[in-house]
Regions:
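Middle-to-C-terminal accessory/interaction subdomains
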Residues: 45, 56-58, 87, 101, ...
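Boundary at the C-terminal end of the N-terminal hydrophobic targeting segment
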Residues: 21, 25-29
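Bacterial N-terminal signal peptides
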Residues: 10-21
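Low-complexity, Pro/Thr/Ser/Gly/Ala-rich linker/spacer regions in secreted
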Residues: 28-40, 417-432
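Internal "kinase-insert"/substrate-recognition segments embedded within catalytic cores
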Residues: 112-115, 129-131, 145-150, 162-275
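C-terminal outer-membrane/trafficking sorting elements
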Residues: 423-473
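Short, well-structured beta-strand/strand-turn elements
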Residues: 144-156, 282
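Conserved NTP-binding catalytic cores of kinases and kinase-like/nucleotidyltransferase enzymes
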Residues: 28-139
Length: 473
């Protein structure tokens, strides 16, 4: 028998039941939100039609859902499947912070290897939110000579009969002949001779189960997520931990002239990776989505890349990007130490001399033209996900602003190459002048010489700053 001593309590409970029936339950929080579901595709570029087997939204990032798909193309060049004869696949959500948005990103696993929109055959693909810096950055990676850079193509998407906007259909990062083309080490490998090769890892800013962690320096922890192999034997985990602790020690060696990090890392590839992050002005460059891979072989080294998750700050650069993000929550791993090494700086200068003409001509010319075909699709996407009171710019304005920023970044970097008279001199802050933000477990999440900047926009939680507890509600 319910014990309730007031009519008000009964009304409160009744109202709660009524509201719970009207609002999404916790298991539905990641369902697609309606926004303006009456908007139609522009039909000016290819459209992917996806239908889940049960007709329901994709709400999980862990569990795949059976689905079918087909692609129509107004130019009739890359159509695939039909409405009456669709192709089979699995689909799930993907991403970290991007999964929390109304417009969701997805991971696709086809039943058979197929070429989508002219890209090399594979079963594995991603649908990412359309983002102009991603298109610009992937083209940059291709032109600058990374070992492999994911291809990406704009496409409109209709899910279960509802238009969900403009996406980038993108190759996912994985070991394969047409992608990261190296030996693939099996999970739970115990064979000592093959453990040192066939690795695909990521310096990550998120905690994952398939990860090793250790203290990089006295300021922050480094997370190394092992994507392949994903499940490690004791021998594999011990080797990977020792390998990266050794590599970290070499990078932080006080005497850079005798440091041995170059015996472990491909210097040329790291120089190219650094240039991409600087030209893009990508604040995430060295603390998340920082991939490395290593083939099997006596002389194999860790190779930086592939690139992923690129952005552009659209600001006036006054320093190297990783230094301009001093108040950012996550740490720029290794790059500050690498720039103290003359060999690395020389490698950066050599690569820049090679790629600068291409960047200042071919890349910037590409940026001035590449977005025009997607103007109508971009407009429909913005109508589909319109926010009340928010005015959005047309794609040509977004592209013009991005191109202007990237051209300015190219010019700035050309005038401030490492180890040249115009290079920026590092500013070393003494401990007394710094405000260091610690988690309750002792990890450093931010360092700033200004207290307000140190605590600005911290995620919800409890922190220690200057010996005092700071609670962010």
């Amino acid at each position: 028998m319910m014990k309730c001593n007031s009519i008000g309590s009964i009304l409160f409970l009744t109202l709660g039941v009524m509201l719970s029936a009207l609002l999404p339950c916790s298991g539905q929080q990641n369902a697609e939100l309606p926004a303006d579901a009456t908007v139609e595709p522009s039909r000016t570029i290819p459209i992917m039609y996806i239908s889940t087997a049960d007709g329901k939204p994709i709400v999980s990032k862990e569990e795949y859902k059976r689905a079918t798909f087909y692609i129509t193309d107004p130019a009739k060049e890359v159509s695939l499947g039909t409405a009456t004869a669709p192709l089979e696949m699995n689909i799930r959500g993907r991403g970290h912070s991007s999964w929390k948005a109304d417009k969701k990103p997805y991971r696709l696993k086809l039943d058979e290897k197929l070429s989508l929109l002219g890209m090399p055959k594979s079963k594995h693909w991603a649908l990412l939110k359309f983002w102009a810096p991603t298109m610009a950055g992937m083209k940059l990676g291709e032109l600058i000579g990374m070992a492999w850079t994911p291809s990406t193509r704009p496409i409109e998407v209709v899910l279960n009969g509802e238009y969900i906007g403009l996406y980038l259909l993108t190759e996912t990062i994985r070991i394969a002949k047409s992608r990261v083309n190296i030996y693939e080490q099996p999970d739970l490998n115990e064979e000592a001779a093959t453990i040192p090769g066939g690795w695909l890892v990521e310096v990550d800013n998120y905690r994952e189960d398939n990860q090793i962690r250790f203290r990089e320096n006295d300021r922050w922890i480094i997370n190394i997520t092992h994507h392949s192999p994903k499940r490690l034997s004791t021998a594999q985990k011990e080797w990977l931990t020792a390998e990266f602790k050794g590599l970290n020690s070499d990078i932080y060696a006080p005497d850079k002239a005798t440091s041995r990090w170059e015996e472990r890392i491909d210097v040329d590839a790291m120089a190219r990776f650094f240039i991409i992050q600087e030209v893009m002005d990508n604040p995430d460059g060295f603390h998340g989505s920082f991939y490395l891979h290593k083939d099997l072989g006596e002389d194999s080294k860790w190779v930086a890349g592939p690139i992923w998750d690129l952005t552009c700050m659209n600001r006036e650069k006054t320093d190297y990007t990783f230094r301009m993000t001093a108040s950012y929550v996550f740490a720029p791993h290794w790059i500050g130490e690498l720039l103290k090494d003359d060999d690395f700086n020389s490698a950066v200068g050599k690569v820049w001399q090679e790629v600068y003409p291409t960047l200042s001509n071919e890349w910037l010319n590409y940026l001035e033209k590449c977005f025009a075909p997607y103007e109508a699709a971009y407009r429909q996407d913005k109508l589909r996900w319109a926010e009340a009171g928010v005015t959005t710019q047309p794609l040509h304005s977004v592209a013009e602003k991005l191109t202007t920023s990237l051209r300015r970044n190219v010019d700035w970097f050309n005038a401030h190459l490492p180890a040249t008279p115009n290079a920026i001199t590092p500013v070393v802050l003494t401990t007394d002048s710094r405000h260091i933000v610690y988690t309750m477990s002792g990890e450093v999440v931010r360092i700033s010489d200004d207290y307000d900047e140190a605590i600005r926009d911290l995620p919800q939680g409890v922190y220690i700053v200057g010996g005092h507890k700071v609670i962010v509600p």
